[in-house]
């Protein structure tokens, strides 16, 4: 990894802004900004400081050549540190609420929801209503909360990821919103804003049966497996609505089953997320999506380890 990538990974892990990192390194904001924008190269003394901070933050004893390899190794170390991520979340009400809030707010906002994070919190945890917001948006928040609660309990029993679970999650998410909640679509759909062909509705049950079998196959590279499954699910687009939300819940089910923190895909990363997904679906290149998921899981670990950004 070059020094720019080391700094970027330090930022991602710690949540520190550029001012704070500059202070830690003993340089000006302007100097750090020049390094990050490839307009200058750190002097040898600062290269040593960057590497020292990188090793301190990551807990590694070396700097990896490849950024994605460094992130993957960091994830493995965090898995070893957190012996049971799911139980850790469930046994800590504040942490659990933060995951439910972050996952619900971001997932709904990615799909066009207009509730703020504070409004989402008030609806979910205090049963507040906002006259300026639609009843559907209120239901989307409460339903996503219910889906996560159901999912956490389901995973505690070490139950398999199967079609029954996928249909149940859709039923919960679309309860009171769509009449086809809990059923595969029986009509054609297209992915808005993407030139990606979706499956013929007649083939959906067969494709989902195959997908459910593949979800539970063991893989040496968990993140690669998750990226492939997520890409396939979203291209099948098995439901009339709610595919993105269900897909991200399945992604986090797979991650939690392998003792990873949930992937928190932030609304501000929406375009990058869609771009990575598009490359996986049209070019069969899952590497960008894998890297994106790695970053999103690291966001989840910030909640798990109480690092705020």
Where are each of the predicted segments found?
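FIC/Doc superfamily catalytic core
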Residues: 1-241, 245-309
């Amino acid at each position: 990894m070059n020094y720019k990538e080391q700094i970027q990974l330090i930022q991602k892990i710690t949540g520190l802004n550029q001012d704070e990192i500059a202070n830690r390194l003993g340089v000006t904001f302007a100097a750090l900004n020049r390094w990050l924008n490839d307009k200058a190269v750190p002097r040898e003394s600062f290269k040593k400081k960057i590497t020292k901070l990188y090793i301190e933050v990551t807990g590694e004893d070396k700097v990896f050549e490849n950024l994605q390899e460094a992130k993957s190794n960091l994830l493995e170390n965090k898995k070893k540190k957190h012996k049971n991520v799911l139980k850790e979340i469930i046994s800590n009400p504040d942490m659990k609420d933060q995951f439910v809030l972050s996952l619900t707010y971001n997932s709904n906002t990615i799909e066009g929801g207009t509730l703020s994070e504070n409004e989402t919190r008030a609806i979910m945890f205090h049963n507040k209503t906002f006259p300026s917001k639609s009843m559907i948006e209120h239901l989307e928040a409460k339903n996503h909360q219910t889906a996560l609660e159901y999912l956490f309990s389901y995973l505690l029993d070490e139950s398999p990821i199967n079609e029954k679970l996928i249909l149940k999650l859709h039923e919960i998410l679309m309860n009171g919103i769509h009449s086809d909640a809990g059923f595969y679509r029986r009509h054609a759909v297209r992915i808005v804003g993407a030139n990606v062909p979706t499956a013929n509705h007649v083939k959906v049950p067969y494709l989902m049966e195959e997908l459910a079998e593949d979800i539970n196959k063991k893989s040496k590279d968990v993140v690669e497996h998750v990226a492939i499954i997520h890409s396939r699910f979203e291209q099948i687009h098995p439901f009339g609505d709610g595919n993105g939300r269900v897909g991200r819940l399945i992604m986090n089910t797979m991650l939690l089953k392998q003792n990873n923190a949930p992937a928190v895909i932030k609304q501000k990363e929406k375009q990058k997320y869609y771009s990575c997904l598009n490359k996986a679906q049209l070019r069969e290149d899952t590497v960008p999506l894998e890297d994106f998921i790695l970053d999103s899981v690291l966001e989840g670990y910030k909640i798990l380890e109480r690092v705020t950004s």
